[in-house]
């Protein structure tokens, strides 16, 4: 089914001496015609992987994309589907030395590139998994002041198994010894160092940056995301890597600042953290 629609992978979206192999986007064109009255949207996926895993990139969306391409009722409203790559953190020796807001800046560049090519303005939906869900909602929380041209905010965002409060995530898994060092490395690699310990309030500049980067710490979505039509959070209670409370508490934050009915939740998906994109039926 997917072969019926033109697909191009690894399309560069940054053209400068600072571009890397991560500055690419996979594109599948479904129906880019603007000649009829059917409202159509671009669907843009942001992968997870803890801002650092080189084995989890845009191509992990291919299964979900192929499932979507089987749904005629959905396709009637889709202009195209894209999956974004962005610079990673965690291992400078391998070129993975991005630090917040580098990941977010790359996502904005990719969306800006797609908009310049296809002209969808705010007619796009962002789907993010795990760290990709963080990035998706960072687009909505960010004020319209940036050193980069900021694309228009999406009409809808779907966050799957998302990380929305960085400090709370670390505290919630601190008692799990096998995850503790891994999570400290992941979060400090992406957002900067801090003197963290279970149950303590983080101190210093970096802790402030962690909070500034956490979608659950923002309280002004009503003004920063004025065109919001849907904010959907989905999560599995069986998620072994990101606690369900990340989504339940963030839902409360969103409901307090967005109009009634905009926030929708589904916290009954089955499976582990990565089953969301490895077994795409639920998310589709």
Swiss-Prot record:
The active site is at 130 (nucleophile). A motif (HGGXW) lies at residues 47-51. InterPro entries: AB_hydrolase_fold, BD-FAE-like_dom, GDXG_lipolytic_enzyme. It is an enzyme of class 3 (hydrolase). Pfam families: BD-FAE. PANTHER family: AB HYDROLASE SUPERFAMILY PROTEIN C4A8.06C, KYNURENINE FORMAMIDASE. Kynurenine formamidase; part of the cluster that mediates the biosynthesis of a highly modified cyclo-arginine-tryptophan dipeptide (cRW). Within the pathway, avaC catalyzes the deformylation of the cyclo-Arg-formylkynurenine iketopiperazine (DKP), produced by the FAD-dependent monooxygenase avaB. The first step of the pathway is perfornmed by the arginine-containing cyclodipeptide synthase (RCPDS) avaA that acts as the scaffold-generating enzyme and is responsible for formation of the cyclo-Arg-Trp (cRW) diketopiperazine. This is Kynurenine formamidase avaC. It comes from Aspergillus versicolor. The gene is avaC.
């Amino acid at each position: 089914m997917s072969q019926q629609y033109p697909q191009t992978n690894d399309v560069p979206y940054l053209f400068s001496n600072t571009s890397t192999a991560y500055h690419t986007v996979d594109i599948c064109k479904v129906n880019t015609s603007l000649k009829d009255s059917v409202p159509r949207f671009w669907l843009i996926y942001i992968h997870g992987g803890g801002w650092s895993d080189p084995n989890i990139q845009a191509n992990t969306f291919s299964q979900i994309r192929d499932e979507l391409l089987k749904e005629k009722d959905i396709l009637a409203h889709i202009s195209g589907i894209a999956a974004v790559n962005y610079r990673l953190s965690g291992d400078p020796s391998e070129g993975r030395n991005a630090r917040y807001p580098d990941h977010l800046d790359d996502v904005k560049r990719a969306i800006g590139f797609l908009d310049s090519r296809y002209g969808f303005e705010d007619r796009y939906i962002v789907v993010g998994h795990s760290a990709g869900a963080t990035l998706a909602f960072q687009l909505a929380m960010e004020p319209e002041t940036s050193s980069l041209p900021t694309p228009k905010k999406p009409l809808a965002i779907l966050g799957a198994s998302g990380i929305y409060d960085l400090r709370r995530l670390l505290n919630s898994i601190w008692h799990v010894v096998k995850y503790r060092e891994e999570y400290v490395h992941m979060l400090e690699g992406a957002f900067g160092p801090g003197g963290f310990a279970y149950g303590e309030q983080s101190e210093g500049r970096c802790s402030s940056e962690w909070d500034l980067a956490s979608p659950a710490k923002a309280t002004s979505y009503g003004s920063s995301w004025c065109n919001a039509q849907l904010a959907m959070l989905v999560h599995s209670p069986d998620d072994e890597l990101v606690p369900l409370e990340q989504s339940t508490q963030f839902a409360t934050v969103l409901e307090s600042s967005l109009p009634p009915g905009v926030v929708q939740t589904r916290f009954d998906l089955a499976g582990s953290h990565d089953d969301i994109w490895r077994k795409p039926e639920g998310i589709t």
